[in-house]
Amino acid sequence: MHFDIAVVLFVIMNLALGVKMNLKNTLLAFTTWTSIGNSNWYITAVLGMYLIIILAFSVFRKHKLPALITVSVLTVVFAIVLLKVGKPEWYYNTLLLFPVGMWYAYLKKHIDKFVMKNNLTYMFFMVAAVGLFTVCYRIKGFGLPFYWIYACAFMMIIILITMKVKIGNPILSMLGRHVFGIYILQRIPMPIFQRLGLNGNNMLYFFLCFAVTLLMSAVFDMLMKKLDKKLFA
């Protein structure tokens, strides 16, 4: 529902700017399948993964292992479907990280204990992850499996860093609370400021877009919370 309300804002913006829209594409934009200027691929991916998880855990319920295997297999199928219907690569090239993250959570206690056994073991895995990332960066264009390995290697590096370093501050926390609003609304100020000719100064354009996006996302999230309370309280 929040996504569709955001799409309505894009419809209003396009009408105000005189951007042409056809009915079919506009209606499909409300399903996340197409776009009228809004970001949509991430929502398509998340909705698909939610459906896969609901299906897997509805069938296997408390049996986590077969549910995880099912999620992994269906994620690969989902990625292949998106590839075959002609969706851009960013729709599916990081999908596998979702079940990989679930596997890590499932085995976290054992993985962390083994990796953090001593500094030598930790450095071995860090060097291996960085090496794999570097190699796969050069060959990631050879096919989806190579990109998945590249993406997983990057995720491994981040996980290994967070095993040693705690990352967090009020700014990151604030951005995390408003991540959906920022993601979905960021493309509204961009064309408006472009139309006003403010994109001639890159720094001014960037900071204006960033500031307005933050303000819009904060207001949007506040209004959505109030709407949710009225509808679901």
Describe these PLM feature segments.
Residues 12, 125-230:
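Alpha-helical transmembrane segments of multi-pass integral membrane proteins
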Residues 35-41, 59-66, 88, 114-118, ...:
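Short, amphipathic, aromatic/basic-enriched membrane-interface segments that mark the entry/exit
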Residues 30-45, 81-100, 132-157, 202-207:
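Interfacial loop-to-helix transition and helix-capping segments at the boundaries
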Residues 9, 24-34, 50-59, 78-84, ...:
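Short juxtamembrane and helix-loop transition motifs at transmembrane-helix boundaries
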Residues 1-35, 49, 114-125, 174-184, ...:
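Transmembrane alpha-helical segments and their boundary/interface "anchor" motifs
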Residues 80-87, 104-114, 159-167, 189, ...:
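Juxtamembrane membrane-interface segments at transmembrane alpha-helix termini
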Residues 17-18, 61, 82-86, 194, ...:
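Short helix-capping/hinge motifs at transmembrane helix termini and TM-loop junctions
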Residues 50-74, 103-123, 198:
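Solvent-exposed interhelical
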